[in-house]
Each structure stands twice: as structure tokens, then as C-alpha cells.
A protein has these predicted regions:
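Short loop/turn segments immediately following the C-termini of beta-strands
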Residues: 10-12, 58-60, 102-104, 112, ...
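Short loop/turn segments immediately following beta-strands, especially the blade-tip
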Residues: 22-28, 70-71, 110-119, 165-171, ...
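A short beta-strand motif characteristic of beta-propeller blades
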Residues: 31-37, 73-79, 122, 128-133, ...
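Blade-loop segments of beta-propeller domains
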Residues: 32-94
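Beta-rich, blade/repeat-based domains predominating
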Residues: 39-49, 81-92, 128-148, 180-195, ...
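Asp-box/WD-like beta-propeller blade repeats and closely related beta-sheet repeat scaffolds
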Residues: 74-142
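Loop-centered beta-sheet repeat module
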Residues: 151-206
Length: 336
């Protein structure tokens, strides 16, 4: 069986924009890297159910978001002065797209137009700072939906996870804020499919916080666990976090140690570290589990390679198949 994999990239060196490749799930191989669309540093991608592609985008020196049709043709940009976004997500129910702007500390809401294009519906600016040198101001790194359809943001600069109520027209109202460990740097969050549990990966202190979620935007801390070996003393920053479809295993990436941390999810939703798998590349900013759950594809921003792992569905553990497929400056892996 062949699946199409899409890659978001930086375009600082050799990359031209958004790429795709064919993944053969029987062989565990990637083939036929193809440029889908030229776009300046499309570092995060999201598809809607109709097949429109939304990416971090830029135009004429301004930053924002780009919308593409099913064939990869540009529909429009929505941009303003300053740096582009760092995260994009689709809300099918409300016909919206969400964006996070790291440099401006903003969460943005876009209305989807009839042709799949976008227009800005609302935005909110975060304020504050943290203890770490990378926390001089608010840095919103994530904006997506909770299981009960609230908007949730992770702010790396303020160590805060904020939930918003979203009106039908895209207007947002803050509901509640969870404060993670000081200097932790909240980056991304995923929610368990069965338990009222969320997993928050923190970039600056290389941890995952396990949170009890009560369903109305409120969190309580359950556990904090490291993503690193106990004896590691080098520089590291975490990046992506993914949950297996059966809810039994959790994965997080380390940049610096250049590895994937693998956790077993226990009966109360807490985590047990069971493996740290080297990715054999530099700076694994993103990875994803294939739709059939049998493989993981990790990409490396600095070494321009994709690493393919076989995933054991019973144990959750990973075995590397290869690490030599070329993808320039890749920082996002997704499937249509």
C-alpha cells in the first residue's frame, strides 16, 4: 500500500517549499520526492477534509498563512507585518482555521471561504514572559482544538496553556489558563482518546507534563516526566508529540539528543518511559505515525533526511529501517 506524505520545510538553504513523497507501507520506504508548491518557509501544514492545504506562509516580506487548492495551486495569502506563523490547524465544524504566531505571541482565527481561501476573523495577543532566556516575551507555539471543541493554545514564552471559547463567527473569548513549571516552555499538547488526560510537551526543560482535563478548559497536574536519559548533560529542546491511535503509547522528539522518547501509557493515564530511539539525524523537529500505525517517519531540519521506523503495535517500541531519504530542511510531516 502506498500513502502520500507531505513535508513542510524552511527555505533558508535548498528547499523551495512544500514537498510530498510516496510511502510504501509494505516495504517501509519513501520514494519520489516532489515539489508540491513553492512557498517561503512553509513550516507547518494542515489539510481540511475537502483536500485544501493550509500552511505557514509569507508574501512580499510579510508573514501569515497560505491556502492552496487540492492541486496545490495557491488560493490566497493572509499576511501582515512581521514573521509568519508556526502552527496551523483546521476546525471543520465551524469552518475555521487557527494559527499560532510565535514571534508576535498571537493566536489567530481565519474564516474559510467558499473556494477554500481564508480571511481573518479574530486574533488575541498574549502578554508576559518567563524565566528562561528564550522567554523574553509571549511565544504562542500551538493553537488547535480540545476534544470538546474549545480552542487551546500553548505559549512557550509565558509557560501557559490557555483555552478559548469559539463563537460560530470565529470570535474567541478566553476561558481558563493552566500554568506549567516555570521555565518549562509549553510547546504542543495532545489529548488522550479515552481518558480525560492531556500530554503537554515542554521545549525548554525537556519534559512532558501529564494533565487531568475536566472538559471545560481546566487542567490539573498529574505527572512530569523527562524525555531524556538520566545521564545526558548536553543541550536539548523537545519538539513534536504524538499519540498512538489505540491510546497505549506516546512519543516525543528531542532536538540535541536527536531521538524519540517512547512511553507506555498506564491505567491512570500517567507515563512510563520504555525506550529512547536515536533518529540518526540532526534536529528532528517533527515526526508522525503513519495512518496504519505501523511506522513512524521523523524529519530533520539540519541534516535534510527522513528516518523511517517500524513501530511494534504491541510493545510500542521502534526499530529503525532507514535514515537516508533526502528531504531538504524538513520540519513538518503530515498526511492528507
Amino acid at each position: 500500500m502506498t500513502q502520500t506524505v507531505y513535508f513542510g520545510t524552511y527555505t533558508r538553504r535548498d528547499s523551495k517549499g512544500i514537498y510530498k513523497a510516496d510511502f510504501n507501507s509494505n516495504k517501509g520506504t519513501l520514494e519520489n520526492l516532489t515539489l508540491v508548491a513553492e512557498e517561503p518557509s512553509p513550516t507547518y501544514l494542515a489539510f481540511d477534509k475537502a483536500g485544501h492545504l493550509y500552511s505557514v506562509g509569507a508574501k512580499d516580506g510579510q508573514g501569515g498563512i497560505a491556502a492552496f487548492d487540492q492541486a496545490g495551486q495557491l488560493l490566497n495569502h493572509v499576511v501582515e507585518e512581521g514573521a509568519p506563523l508556526c502552527y496551523v490547524a483546521v476546525d471543520e465544524e465551524r469552518n475555521l482555521v487557527y494559527g499560532a504566531n510565535y514571534h508576535k505571541g498571537q493566536v489567530l482565527v481565519y474564516k474559510r471561504l467558499a473556494d477554500g481561501g481564508l480571511e481573518l476573523a479574530d486574533s488575541a495577543s498574549h502578554q508576559g514572559q518567563g524565566l528562561h532566556t528564550n522567554q523574553a516575551s509571549a511565544h504562542v507555539h500551538y493553537a488547535d482544538l480540545t476534544p470538546d471543541q474549545y480552542l487551546i493554545t500553548c505559549d512557550l514564552g509565558t509557560d501557559e496553556v490557555t483555552t478559548y471559547d469559539v463563537a460560530a463567527d470565529g470570535k474567541i473569548t478566553p476561558l481558563d489558563t493552566y500554568k506549567c513549571a516555570a521555565g518549562a516552555g509549553a510547546r504542543h499538547i495532545v489529548f488522550h482518546h479515552h481518558y480525560k488526560i492531556a500530554y503537554l510537551i515542554c521545549e525548554l526543560n525537556s519534559t512532558i507534563e501529564v494533565l487531568i482535563y475536566d472538559g471545560v478548559g481546566h487542567f490539573e497536574h498529574l505527572q512530569t516526566i523527562s524525555t531524556l536519559p538520566e545521564d545526558f548533560e548536553g543541550a536539548n529542546g523537545t519538539a513534536a508529540i504524538r499519540l498512538s491511535a489505540d491510546g497505549k503509547f506516546l512519543y516525543g522528539s528531542n532536538r540535541g539528543h536527536d531521538s524519540l522518547a517512547v512511553y507506555k501509557i498506564l491505567a491512570d493515564g500517567s507515563l512510563e518511559l520504555i525506550q529512547i530511539a536515536p533518529t540518526n539525524g540532526q534536529n528532528p523537529r517533527d515526526f508522525n505515525i503513519t495512518p496504519d500505525q505501523n511506522h513512524i517517519i521523523a524529519v530533520h531540519q539540519d541534516s535534510d533526511n527522513a528516518t523511517i521506523f517500524k513501530r511494534d503495535a504491541e510493545s510500542g517500541k521502534l526499530t529503525e529501517i532507514s535514515h537516508d531519504f533526502y528531504v531538504p530542511e524538513a520540519v513538518c510531516v503530515t498526511f492528507k
